[in-house]
Structure formats: C-alpha cells, structure tokens
C-alpha cells in the first residue's frame, strides 16, 4: 500500500515460522487479492546447529504439504539468514539465501549452480563509518552480483520483548542503540553519516549496474 516495494522484489515475511499453514494461506490469499509484492516465508532463523536444522526440516515438511494442499501457492519461496553449516544441510530447500557479508566467490558460484537467489546482510558496519557503508552497498554488491543487501537493523532496541522500546523512549537523548543506523532524538530520528553513505552506495550500484547508452546509429 505504501508503494515502497516494487514487483519482482520479494518481501520477507518475518515470523512466518511462528504460525501455521492455516495462517500462511490467509495472508498469502490477502496478498494475491491486494496485489502485494511476493512474500517469502522466513523459516527458522540461522539454522546453524542441529536443533535449528531439525526444526527447519519440520517446517519444510509443513511447507511441502501446504503446497500440495494449496496449489495456487505452490510457488511461494522460503528464506532465512544462513551460513555454511545451514547451506550444507538445507541449502537445496531454501530458495533465497541471506548470507552474512564477507563471503567469498565460492558462495556466489554455489548459489548460481543451485539456482538460488543470494542476498546479504551486515551487522558489523558502524554508523560513523561512511566509507565501508558506501562500499558495501555500492561496489561490493555490484562486484559479487548478489541481488539484495541490508543492514542488520535501522534501529534495534536489543531484544524482542513488548517493552523493549520503553527505556529508549523514556530517555532518547542518552540512549545508544547498538547495530543501529539512526539516532533517536526528542524532536526526530536523526540519521548518522553511515546512513547517508548507504544511500550513496545504492546510487553508485545503480550507476554501475546500468548499461551504457549505445552509440547513435
């Protein structure tokens, strides 16, 4: 509804693994009716140990049955933040791999060989580090050929409890948000230089990815 998403760019449905197939159908039906962008189901965050891998397999069994029961949603895609252990165990099942930044060319080749969409995220960039933010969203993403990138968080209070933001809102001036690219102030949310550099990096990426104009006939 906000028009901030465009066709061809999947939106991640965080928390899809917290509900079941009945809710999946309700939300996906709504998405089709209202012509939303594609929703990719986020199933089991960071499956890097056996317990998480086993839970992901349980969720994929549900997803497989869901696609059989509701063929109109048979093309729904799955995703998660994933590393080498998770890819080895489950890479063939996830449609979109969201890998931590810093991976090498072998992962790019593996994703292409397995016909997977490769995205990246980073939680090590600093809001005061303009150069690295610009490089990550610009040259690095273009050079690797990945199709999506993101910071860990625009603003992260540190946990997911219902009261997580209370301390921040009660003292915005003296609260520092870790892994965040915004500074909450009493009058507004103030973006640091790192956030401005993200925008520059995106502009550079667009420039690099745009084919040059052909010479006139």
Which residues are covered by each model-predicted region?
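Catalytic domains of carbohydrate-active enzymes that cleave complex glycans
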Residues: 1-50, 61-85, 161-217
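Catalytic-core region of carbohydrate-active enzymes that cleave or remodel glycosidic bonds
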Residues: 91, 96-174
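Eukaryote-skewed repeat-based solenoidal scaffolds used as protein-protein interaction platforms
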Residues: 46, 54-119, 124
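The substrate-binding groove and active-site-proximal loops of carbohydrate-active enzymes
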Residues: 10-19, 40-53, 94-100, 121-132
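A general structural detector for well-ordered alpha-helical segments in enzyme core domains, enriched
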Residues: 23-30, 55-63, 107, 136-140
């Amino acid at each position: 509804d906000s028009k901030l998403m465009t066709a061809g760019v999947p939106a991640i449905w965080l928390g899809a693994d917290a509900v079941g197939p009945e809710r999946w159908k309700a939300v996906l039906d709504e998405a089709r009716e209202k012509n939303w962008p594609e929703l990719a189901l986020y199933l089991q965050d960071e499956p890097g140990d056996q317990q998480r891998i086993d839970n992901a397999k349980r969720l994929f069994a549900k997803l497989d049955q869901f696609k059989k029961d509701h063929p109109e949603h048979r093309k729904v895609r799955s995703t998660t933040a994933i590393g080498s252990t998770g890819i080895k165990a489950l890479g063939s099942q996830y449609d979109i791999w969201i890998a931590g930044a810093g991976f090498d060319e072998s992962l790019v080749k593996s994703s292409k060989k397995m016909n997977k969409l490769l995205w990246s995220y980073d939680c090590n960039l600093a809001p005061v580090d303009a150069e690295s933010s610009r490089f990550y969203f610009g040259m690095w993403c273009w050079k690797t050929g990945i199709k999506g990138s993101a910071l860990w968080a625009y603003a992260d209070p540190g946990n997911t409890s219902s009261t997580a933001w209370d301390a921040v809102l009660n003292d915005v001036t003296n609260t520092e948000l870790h892994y965040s690219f915004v500074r909450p102030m009493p009058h507004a949310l103030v973006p640091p230089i790192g956030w401005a550099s993200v925008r520059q990096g995106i502009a550079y990426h667009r420039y690099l990815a745009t084919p040059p104009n052909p010479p006139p006939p």
